[in-house]
Amino acid sequence: MFICKICDEEYDENMRYSRDSRYCKKCGEERTQYLSYRRDTLASLRSMPLEAKIIQTKFLINQAVRTFGEDHCYISYSGGKDSTVLSHITKQLYPNILHLFANTTNEYPETLKHIQWEIKENHTNIIIVYPIDSKGEMWNFKKVVEHYGYPMFSKRVSNAIRTYQHAKTPHTKQNSIDYIERNFKKYQKYMESPISDKCCDKLKKEPLRRKAKELGMECVILGILASESYQREKAWLEYGCNVFYKFKDNQCKPLSFWTDDDINEYIEKYNVKIPDLYNMDYTRNGCMFCGFGVHLEAPESNRYQKLKETHPKQYAYFIDNFGGMMLQFDIIV
């Protein structure tokens, strides 16, 4: 017998939803129809012209601020294109809204330079948050890798491998093996490699949450696009842009339905200043050494080889400390 994840009713093999055994047939079919409708809705939102998207984005931001108050909302600011567009729009409504920037110790120099410009020249209300844990211990990228493993391939793959490696019971371990076999067969050979998804938690998410709690913040405004990853699109299909009082963190994601083209159009149209990194043919400003998605890049011209050209000092540090790991992961550096 099984227990449906939605209705909590027991069901046997004959009443199991064929596409996903977590649901009974009735709930599984209804969920599939709902997600299909949500995908159509997302496609419709994405097809709107830029000015309509700006109006909708401002509505969502206002909804968050009206719900929690301006003094209890903050922008999680990375210094990248998406969060800079979000900041530009939000400051039109609330010029002094708080921004929290997590210095992960793995930032591009151009990102840090842009943060200082935002603070000193653009008068953006930014607090820089460092990766200090609840015990007062300072972390950095190398320390996280040594303790937990390297962020490689994708968050889902890294999480699956970490779960397998740290399973506390034979049952959990077998479930992890089955999950990887079912979803990530091509990564099975890396199951014993030092891989983990904990990096973002230790260097960014947890320090930001602690600082937000310390400051009495109740809602985070995030400049993320649903198109950026499977997980983000799945989250939008399930919950939409503004997710209040459902989870531990209240979230406003008013750019979810934007595309990369929308972001670029907005930057050009409104002359928004972004880090010089984007003038060096980079399309993202995330952590320098992050391995998420590197396997999808051209083997002979991936982000690490680009780092060698644009930031030789940082590349030398990367090779000295993590070059051996890249060989284990079959990544050309």
Short names for language-model regions:
Residues 1, 21, 284-287:
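Residues immediately within or flanking Cys/His clusters that coordinate Zn2+
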Residues 38-42, 214, 247-248, 260-333:
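ATP/NTP-dependent adenylation/nucleotidyl-transfer catalytic domains that generate, transfer
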Residues 21-24, 28-39:
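Basic DNA-binding region of bZIP-type proteins
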Residues 8-11, 28-31, 106, 294:
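Cys/His-rich microdomains that often coordinate metals
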Residues 13-22, 279-282:
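Short linker/helix segments within small regulatory modules
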Residues 2-17:
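Short recognition patches in nucleic-acid-associated and regulatory proteins
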Residues 5-6, 26-29, 289:
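Short, cysteine/histidine-rich loop/knuckle motifs that typically chelate Zn2+
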Residues 34-265, 269:
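ATP-dependent adenylation/nucleotidyltransferase module used to activate substrates
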